């Protein structure tokens, strides 16, 4: 059985009992980041003392985007042997801007059973923090790195707003690039409301709200989720 397991997006106290039970019951954990996976298992042992791995041979296997195609046949073989395999990303829900799509696509084709163990996402958390109406929203993944691609996407979103004025957009951006993105946005002639959500659920969580033009000179570090209306 394959389990797609969400993990905390920053605060390990958000770890659920169901997530913990699933992981310690696994034969194999496919981890985008093995170091994060080991930290997570240590957190489970501290927070859920009655839970112990069902096997001392629990494997943690590195499974990141660039290696997904290469490792897929072995994972499918494990599943057909009846192994319990859990997929986790570094944080949040796998497949959402994280590895796992090829695996899920293949198990559906092969009629191998799988289920999702849900949990927090930076997307929904940021939308609530933003204070913006969320009747309709679209998630864009990571914003483009190249200036030309940024400008092209900003113009596309601006056009979408003409047809769907209530739509809000959510995307990930790095602290190193966010200022450039905001300045390009301000220069596009579109000055929307937005929220910049930094280090969500962590000790130094910070939410900045305002117009794009009001936030272009701020300095940001860490992991950033942006909500734009």
Question: Predicted regions span which residues?
Answer:
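Conserved helicase motor
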Residues: 61-69, 142-148
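A contiguous loop/helix-start segment that scaffolds small-molecule binding in enzyme catalytic cores
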Residues: 2, 162-229
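Glycine/small-residue-rich loop that forms an oxyanion/phosphate-binding "nest" at active or ligand-binding sites
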Residues: 64-121
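Glycine-rich, flexible N-terminal cofactor/catalytic loop recognition
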Residues: 1-65
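Alpha-helix capping/helix-boundary segments
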Residues: 35-37, 92-93, 122, 177
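Acidic beta-strand-to-loop metal/phosphate-binding motif
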Residues: 31-32, 86-94, 168-173
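Class I SAM-dependent methyltransferase SAM-binding "motif I" and its flanking Rossmann-like core
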Residues: 102-160
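Short glycine-rich anion-binding loops that position phosphate/pyrophosphate groups of nucleotides
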Residues: 9-12, 90-94, 175-177, 202
């Amino acid at each position: 059985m394959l389990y797609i397991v969400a993990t905390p997006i920053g605060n390990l106290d958000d770890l659920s009992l169901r997530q913990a039970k699933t992981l310690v019951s696994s034969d194999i954990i496919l981890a985008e980041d093995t170091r994060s996976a080991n930290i997570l298992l240590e957190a489970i042992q501290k927070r859920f003392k009655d839970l112990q791995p069902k096997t001392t041979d629990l494997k943690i296997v590195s499974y990141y985007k660039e290696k997904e195609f290469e490792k897929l046949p072995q994972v499918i073989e494990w599943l057909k042997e009846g192994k319990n395999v859990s997929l986790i990303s570094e944080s949040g829900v796998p497949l959402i801007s994280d590895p796992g799509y090829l695996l899920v696509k293949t198990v559906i084709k092969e009629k191998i059973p799988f289920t999702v163990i849900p949990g927090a996402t930076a997307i929904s958390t940021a939308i609530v923090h933003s204070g913006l109406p969320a009747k309709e929203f679209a998630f864009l993944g990571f914003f483009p790195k190249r200036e030309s691609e940024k400008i092209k996407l900003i113009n596309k979103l601006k056009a979408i707003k003409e047809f769907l004025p209530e739509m809000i957009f959510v995307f990930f951006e790095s602290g190193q690039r966010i200022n450039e993105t905001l300045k390009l946005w301000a220069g596009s002639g579109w000055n929307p409301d937005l929220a910049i959500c930094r280090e969500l659920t962590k000790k130094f969580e910070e939410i900045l709200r305002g117009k794009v033009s009001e936030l272009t000179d701020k300095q940001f570090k860490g992991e950033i989720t942006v909500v734009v209306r």
